[in-house]
């Protein structure tokens, strides 16, 4: 089936060097705030791309739970496919796509686990059903729906309303080494600004051809 006639003109914004923030995390924070103001559904949803030990890539949507100058934090099962990938190869890439604003942000970097205290704090902020779910799900392993629901009942009976954080579950932080901000423009002459480390604890910005 051909879908070659599906196209639209991007005309909702511009991205100029003189208007961009000096640091990529400040530019990201600005765009994130604007995505929230525009009521973009789940603006913290991102594609996380990882690569396993054999070089096979995989990608999935996950939600960031924090971002700051240190990087971008998300939580998951350590034994999931992405967890196994990151154990073998800690390099990963993130992609945020805010269609309503005709914007995307690409981020590359190295992923590290956050501290146990940070994982505990976030885990205990979650709804109890989600905390039970972290125990019930042997993420990425084959299972029937009936068996999954049976595991949920078992862990509800075991922990009640106070499940502890499972040892196989916690947080990761992607420490960025590369940012690219993309703003759709007419005639496919999009704006692309790239930030890279300058070797002096700062960042250098330049424009890429669309």
From Swiss-Prot:
Binds 1 FMN per subunit. It catalyses: pyridoxamine 5'-phosphate + O2 + H2O = pyridoxal 5'-phosphate + H2O2 + NH4(+); pyridoxine 5'-phosphate + O2 = pyridoxal 5'-phosphate + H2O2. The keyword Oxidoreductase applies. FMN binds at residues 60-65, 75-76, 81-82, 104, 139-140, 182, 192. Substrate binds at residues 7-10, 65, 122, 126, 130, 188-190. Keywords: Flavoprotein, FMN, Oxidoreductase, Pyridoxine biosynthesis. InterPro entries: Pyridox_Oxase, Pyridox_Oxase_CS, Pyridox_Oxase_N, Pyridoxamine_oxidase_dimer_C, Split_barrel_FMN-bd. Its cofactor is FMN. Homodimer. NCBIfam families: pdxH, PRK05679.1. This is Pyridoxine/pyridoxamine 5'-phosphate oxidase. It comes from Bordetella avium (strain 197N).
